[in-house]
């Protein structure tokens, strides 16, 4: 590895992230019509200047089993998190969930998917999250039927098969903010979230509250 030497940083301000121990972050190079301010080493997508602001991650997933965590920030409602394909353009809609192929949840208990038109579930798909809850997202790209699972504080709350348009495609972690309503993300490296249990994923990588 070729690693840089850090200075004037506390242990809480950095984590190991090398070519052989690399973690996902939010990617400021993905362009949307409205974009958040990405900071804190790519783990915070903060309010910029528009109602609906979107971010996609640095690592696209085509196979394997993947896990990441998030905590809701701000008023609960109208912030979305999940996965999205890459697509050719992210600039033709004010709402990023209405682009490419998308699967997300909203923390009040609804599930959404987009494949040319938006499909919205009824309310009560799961108990609403609070700002103290940990949301775990587990993506299985290896099984014959690819799935995404959502966990609340370590307990499974929702399982969805990937929509047919997503099967076999490259997908990315994705979020859409609503004003200052967002999620603080933990892809396994540095995170703004305070972790008490320091669990690793099934392959022994990352630091998570649950895994």
Stretches found by the model and what they are:
Residues 1-211:
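PRY/SPRY (B30.2) beta-sandwich protein-interaction domains
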């Amino acid at each position: 590895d070729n690693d840089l030497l850090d200075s004037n940083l506390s242990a809480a301000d950095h984590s190991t992230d090398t070519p052989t121990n690399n973690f996902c972050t939010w990617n400021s190079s993905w362009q949307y019509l409205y974009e958040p301010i990405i900071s804190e080493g790519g783990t915070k997508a903060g309010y910029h200047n528009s109602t609906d602001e979107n971010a996609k991650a640095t690592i696209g997933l085509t196979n394997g089993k993947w896990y990441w965590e998030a905590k809701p920030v701000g008023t609960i409602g109208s912030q979305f998190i999940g996965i999205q394909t890459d697509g050719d353009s992210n600039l033709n809609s004010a709402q990023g969930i209405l682009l490419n192929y998308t699967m997300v949840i909203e923390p009040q208990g609804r599930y959404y998917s987009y494949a040319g038109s938006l499909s919205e579930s009824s309310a009560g798909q799961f108990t609403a999250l609070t700002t103290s809850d940990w949301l775990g997202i587990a993506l299985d790209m290896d099984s014959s039927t690819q799935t995404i699972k959502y966990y609340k504080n370590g307990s499974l709350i929702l399982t969805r098969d990937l929509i047919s348009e997503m099967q076999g495609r490259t997908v990315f972690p994705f979020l859409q903010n609503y004003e200052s309503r967002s999620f603080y993300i933990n892809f396994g490296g540095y995170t703004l979230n305070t972790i008490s249990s320091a669990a690793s994923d099934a392959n022994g990588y990352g630091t998570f509250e649950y895994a």
